[in-house]
């Protein structure tokens, strides 16, 4: 199947917008907007994330390290845009969106799912990361930022 046909078909798959965040062993902070995040199992609670091998967060997501899946609210498009742009990479943590006291997380996200990396697998251009959920927190009402067809949904 040609890559272009697959890309067109995937534009019809609506999904919530998530930012993956982590801190490596030397204290450097990383964040990226992720399009491939899904729950994996409920017993034990686990989540699956796919990260391009070229992403700067890639090397921070190793077995035993912590990460956070930040599911964004509708008013957090700016955070998504900053965390998806190579040009804005240096600005990702230069704002008050974050709590960086431990595993970095977005303070007012729709939900924060904290994980410890349990397994990673290489698959062509990506690393598949399985996170064992340690705890989570979420907003009281549903206001999730959604994305499809190359843009944010109302």
What do these predicted ranges mean?
Residues 1-154:
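Basic, polyanion-binding surface patches
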């Amino acid at each position: 199947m040609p890559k272009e046909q697959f890309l067109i078909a995937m534009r019809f798959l609506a999904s919530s917008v998530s930012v993956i965040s982590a801190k490596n062993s030397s204290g450097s902070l990383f964040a990226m907007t992720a399009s491939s995040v899904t729950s994996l199992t409920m017993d034990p609670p686990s989540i699956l994330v796919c990260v391009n091998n070229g992403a700067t967060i890639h090397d921070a997501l190793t077995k035993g390290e912590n990460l956070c899946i930040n599911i964004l609210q509708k008013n957090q498009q700016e955070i998504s845009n900053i965390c998806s742009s190579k040009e804005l990479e240096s600005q990702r943590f230069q704002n008050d969106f974050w709590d960086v006291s431990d595993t970095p997380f977005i303070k007012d996200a729709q939900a924060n799912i904290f994980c410890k990396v349990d397994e990673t697998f290489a698959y062509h251009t990506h690393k598949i990361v399985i996170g064992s959920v340690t705890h989570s927190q979420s907003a009281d009402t549903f206001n999730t930022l959604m994305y499809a067809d190359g843009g944010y949904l109302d």
